[in-house]
Amino acid sequence: MDVARDNNGSCVFFEQEDGRLCVIHREAGVDALPSACRHFPRKFLRDGRGTFVSLSHFCPTAAILLIGAETLEVVPAVPPLMLEEPIEGLDARDALPPLLCPDVLCDLDGYDAWERAAIAVLARPDLTCQRALDWIGAATERVRAWRPGGQSLTSAVAAAFANDAAQVPAPQLTQEEMVDLVWRLSDGRVPSDIEPIDRFEDRWNARVGPAFDRYDGAMKNYVAARIFANWIAYQGRGLRSIVQWGRAAAALVRHHTLRRMLDSGGSPGPDDVIEAIRMADLLLLHVIDTQAFARAVAPIEA
């Protein structure tokens, strides 16, 4: 079902000036909503482990929750978060498990252990988001060395994440390369504020710097949300691609935060971070093709 839009592109059933409510939802109930509206802000993944739901933080309420969350953990999804059938999303129930690297498959238990271990690193209060991503990347390099026939993949994941593995080189795209990649994949469907910022790190340090530290927990929560139940696991060529997906999420938040500071001349506040996260998820979950992202970062799996 399609719904009409006004001259500004907004849904004609959205009461912008009267409580910001949906007329269809109010008058006919959730079952009458178009599928995209019924599912938003949920993003579903279904595989051999079960049905998983994460949130699009383009939804302002979901984005605000990242700022105030004191703990980070995976919890069971219950109604109204979990929907009744039909559920739409990425259905990988009949697919092979995610790739460890281009020529080796994970098993589902091993992949689940890797995903949970990555989220556990992001939940650590003693690590910054950047440090956590580096830890995940380094541990993933050790996991990629696993081959069948010895210890289980689950055990290999536990061993790789148990100690600081930062000395293991982990290939990655730079901040500028990551933003440029997403900009190209957006194919002109977003405003020019996604264009890469020249001398990004210098300007970040001058305009944002330590003022962003108070929001580092929100950044870790956001990156964890993008790693949990991600689609890149089934669309990409290995675990490195998922790490790049997490790095892309962080890079876009940094980009949009700096862009707002360059425009305003101020210091970042909660509203700036919330809007930066919203714009990051708009791009990652609603604008670009995640399959195209997986193809674009595939060379890093070599």
Give each language-model segment a name:
Residues 28-127:
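Internal, well-ordered alpha/beta segment that forms a basic, Gly-enriched binding/recognition surface
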Residues 4-5, 31-34, 53, 243-247, ...:
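Generic alpha-helical scaffold signal
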Residues 1-29:
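Structured, beta-strand-rich domain cores
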Residues 120-302:
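Hydrophobic, aromatic-lined core segments that form the binding pocket/scaffold
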Residues 6, 15-20, 90-102, 264-268:
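Intrinsically disordered, low-complexity coil segments
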Residues 27, 104, 239-243:
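Short, charged/polar micro-motifs that form catalytic or ligand-binding hotspots
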